[in-house]
């Protein structure tokens, strides 16, 4: 069953301990995107001196109320699937595929941009005039694919970890936390991101003395929403490469 999610700071601390066990005490760079960007920001603040430079891409300084609500809703959807069985589904030879697929579809609403959905699918139906809308088929197919490849308890645990993210927790304030680290920091935001809007990366850049782009983040000018970092790979490779080299 799903365990306690634990804050992202615990997960970063575990990664640091693993590195020490392997004999790695200093990292040339730490790069994180989305949830990984939350981890990268924690490296930047909590593990100063361990990474020579850090890149935070499409991630917030803290999870907002809207994001908390979405994470909670997705978790509840999974748990409402009768096959979830209080998290002990493997004992019964089942998996909450329907709940996990629907939770994924909810998340996808924020992973892509609104205009992209309209331009890509519009109100076109799939195959025949009375068939499902193309966007319905797209969401269902992606939900099913995700449910077949991802574990429900892992999904719940990771959702809880994302919800716990707050770089200012226990450090006085987010501003104080960010200002404490002078290490080179690349902050990248996505122009059309609905999941973690550009204002969140702007806050990080403005309060980070090591921000390599000053008080504004580097902006990926893409209309694909949060998933732009997966699509515009040439831009991402060039931007990250220039920072890390």
Model-derived regions, located:
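Acidic catalytic loop of the alpha/beta-hydrolase fold
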Residues: 145, 164-166, 191-196
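Conserved acidic catalytic loop of the alpha/beta-hydrolase fold
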Residues: 9-29, 38
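Short glycine-enriched nucleophile-adjacent loop
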Residues: 37-48, 54
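Active-site nucleophile elbow and catalytic-triad environment of alpha/beta-hydrolase enzymes
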Residues: 141-142, 157-177
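Catalytic active-site module of serine/aspartate enzymes centered on a nucleophile-bearing elbow/loop
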Residues: 202-205, 211-245
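Short alpha-helix in the alpha/beta-hydrolase fold that links the catalytic acid
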Residues: 170-175, 183, 197-207
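Short beta-strand/loop motif that positions the catalytic acidic residue
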Residues: 181, 187-189
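Alpha/beta-hydrolase-fold enzymes
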Residues: 50-52, 56-145
């Amino acid at each position: 069953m799903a365990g306690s999610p634990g804050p992202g700071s615990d997960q970063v601390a575990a990664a640091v301990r693993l590195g020490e066990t392997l004999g790695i005490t200093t990292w040339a760079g730490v790069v994180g995107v989305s949830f990984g960007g939350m981890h990268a920001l924690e490296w930047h603040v909590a593990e100063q001196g361990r990474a020579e430079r850090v890149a935070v891409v499409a991630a917030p300084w803290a999870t907002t109320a809207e994001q908390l609500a979405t994470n909670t809703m997705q978790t509840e959807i999974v748990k409402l699937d009768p096959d979830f069985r209080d998290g002990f589904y493997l004992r019964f030879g089942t998996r909450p595929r329907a709940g996990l697929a629907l939770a994924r579809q909810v998340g996808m609403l924020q992973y892509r941009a609104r205009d992209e959905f309209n331009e890509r699918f519009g109100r076109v139906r799939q195959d025949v005039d009375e068939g499902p809308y193309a966007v319905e088929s797209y969401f269902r197919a992606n939900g099913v694919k995700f449910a077949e490849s991802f574990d429900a308890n892992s999904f719940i645990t990771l959702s809880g970890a994302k919800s716990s993210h707050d770089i200012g927790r226990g450090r006085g304030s987010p501003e104080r936390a960010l200002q404490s680290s002078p290490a080179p920091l690349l902050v990248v935001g996505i122009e059309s991101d609905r999941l973690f809007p550009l204002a969140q990366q702007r806050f990080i850049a403005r309060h980070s003395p090591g921000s390599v782009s000053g008080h504004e983040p580097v902006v990926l000018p893409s209309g694909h929403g949060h998933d732009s970092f997966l699509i515009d790979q040439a831009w991402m490779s060039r931007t990250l490469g220039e920072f890390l080299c």
